Amino acid sequence: MAGAEPFLADGNQELFPCEVCGRRFAADVLERHGPICKKLFNRKRKPFSSLKQRLQGTDIPTVKKTPQSKSPPVRKSNWRQQHEDFINAIRSAKQCMLAIKEGRPLPPPPPPSLNPDYIQRPYCMRRFNESAAERHTNFCKDQSSRRVFNPAQTAAKLASRAQGRAQMGPKKEPTVTSAVGALLQNRVLVATNEVPTKSGLAMDPASGAKLRQGFSKSSKKD
């Protein structure tokens, strides 16, 4: 306030200008006005909306502006690569038709072309478009975690199996006791002696000839 030029108002009262708003106040009033005026001017004011002011006191709701959705960037089509793939496919088809007519073996197919718009997955190394790649990622990650090959762990399993087989030793063949062997021999002898007989016929165990019941084989008379 020292540098401010005083102003004599009516009644010979000196008024001093405010450094912020430029209005003039008495010395005692300016001391109270200064801090308040600085706070008001330093505060960020919201932008004034005349639409809200006009709609106040009415039943019309305020219209919220929908944010404009950003359109995804259009990818450049790789027409040159597609044209070359098309020409290679036609040439390969002509070579196959010519080989069939001449009876020669079919030529190898052209190498597969890589679509630059497809995304390669790090787990299976296959390529998908963007939407399919997002769906496939979790499934492929789960499958690859199940099929992790650990050479050290596999070698340890094989070694433990071989050691267990060596400790078991060779399989012993089943042995037949003497009592069981004698029983089997008796059954064989009984089976050979017992022959089914027909009406009135019997089998001679010595010669194997059939005899009538009640008669025995006699020697021929001289």
From Swiss-Prot:
Annotated positions binding Zn(2+): 18, 21, 33, 37
Cofactors (names): Zn(2+)
Domain of life according to the entry: Eukaryota
Zinc finger (C2HC/C3H-type): 14-43, 117-146
UniProt GO MF annotations: zinc ion binding
Disulfide feature: none
Keywords noted in UniProt: Metal-binding, Repeat, Zinc, Zinc-finger
Family annotation (PANTHER family): C2H2 ZINC FINGER CGI-62-RELATED (PTHR13555), ZINC FINGER C2HC DOMAIN-CONTAINING PROTEIN 1B (PTHR13555:SF36)
Family assignment from sequence similarity: Belongs to the ZC2HC1 family.
This protein's name: Zinc finger C2HC domain-containing protein 1B
Species this chain originates from: Homo sapiens
Lineage: Eukaryota, Metazoa, Chordata, Craniata, Vertebrata
